[in-house]
């Protein structure tokens, strides 16, 4: 049987999360393939995944390529007409339910129009009563480079059960047509971590495609298990990559200048003061490092 769908996820020192995800997927379905890209994890995790899940295709990277680089490795070996990128810290709620049916709803959305190139499921958090994390995005502000995830933090009463276009995909779970990737290009690797899915969304849109939110499929997200909510790594890349995103995507010089001014002179200063007050000089240092590296290292 031909491979219709390639599910791609990245493992980086997250064996338990990756195994939880594998256990929630219909691995016995021969019309799909599951690809795990191991980004140079410690403790030989790639081999452990291969031994536990022989039906899964495991790619060993000899270095950490980041989110985009790891997924691009997966793209290069994927056989499916559709590629489903999901974080390893996500799970489908209950394998006894029709997980493949939910996944197929994303494929059906992509097949409903030649213009749709990318689709995301409803994303809910795994904690408490599983509040909504994502039901689409609002547009990014040209100046602040911020937007809102629709429904984030709300209890799910079915109020976001209608499919609709969204300007950006959520990196935790996004399915893409292969032809859209061939036209738009693979994920931008200059970001390494954070903002690459927003940049890629714009690349997909510039190639002539639209992006949709499809709530007939729901995935549950543990959120930032790989980097931590308040880690210097996360702070550094968020600081640097907001500026990099502006450089790559700002529509004009005026907007770019105003964004730089806002992000460096207001956001970075405020964040640094906040971190120092809360006795987190490591995070304040990460902010400064992110700005310094953005200014002193050109990236396309």
Predicted regions and their residues:
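Short, acidic, metal-binding catalytic loop of nucleotide-sugar glycosyltransferases
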Residues: 23-32
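Short aromatic/hydrophobic "clamp" motif used to bind/position activated sugar donors
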Residues: 83
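Acidic/His-rich active-site region of diverse nucleotide-sugar glycosyltransferases
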Residues: 97-185, 190
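Short beta-strand/loop segment that forms part of the nucleotide-sugar
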Residues: 31-40, 59-61
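Non-catalytic, C-terminal membrane-associated alpha-helical segments of glycosyltransferases
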Residues: 233-241, 252-300
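A conserved acidic beta->alpha catalytic loop
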Residues: 15, 24, 38-47, 63
């Amino acid at each position: 049987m031909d491979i219709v769908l390639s599910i791609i996820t990245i493992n980086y020192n997250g064996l338990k999360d990756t195994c939880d995800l594998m256990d929630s997927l219909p691995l016995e379905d021969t019309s799909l393939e599951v690809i795990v890209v191991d980004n140079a994890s410690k403790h030989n995790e790639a081999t452990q995944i291969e031994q536990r899940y022989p039906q899964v295709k495991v790619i060993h990277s000899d270095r950490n390529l980041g989110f985009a680089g790891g997924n691009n490795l997966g793209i290069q070996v994927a056989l499916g007409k559709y590629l489903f990128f999901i974080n390893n810290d996500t799970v489908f709620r209950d394998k006894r339910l029709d997980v493949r049916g939910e996944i197929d709803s994303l494929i059906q959305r992509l097949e409903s129009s030649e213009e749709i190139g990318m689709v995301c499921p409803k994303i809910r958090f795994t904690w408490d009563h599983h509040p909504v994390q994502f039901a689409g995005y609002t547009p990014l502000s040209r100046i602040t480079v911020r937007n809102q995830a629709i429904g984030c933090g709300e209890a799910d009463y079915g109020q976001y059960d209608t499919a609709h276009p969204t300007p950006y995909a959520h990196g935790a779970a996004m399915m893409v047509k292969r032809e859209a990737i061939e036209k738009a290009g693979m994920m931008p690797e200059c970001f390494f971590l954070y903002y690459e899915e927003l940049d890629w969304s714009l690349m997909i849109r510039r190639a002539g495609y639209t992006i949709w939110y499809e709530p007939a499929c729901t995935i549950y997200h543990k959120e930032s298990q790989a980097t931590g909510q308040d880690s210097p790594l996360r702070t550094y890349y968020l600081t640097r990559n907001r500026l990099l995103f502006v450089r790559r995507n700002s529509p004009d010089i005026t907007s770019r200048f105003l964004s730089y001014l806002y992000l460096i002179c207001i956001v970075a200063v405020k964040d640094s003061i906040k971190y120092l007050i809360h006795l987190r000089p490591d995070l304040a240092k990460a902010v400064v490092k992110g700005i310094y590296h953005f200014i002193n290292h050109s990236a396309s």
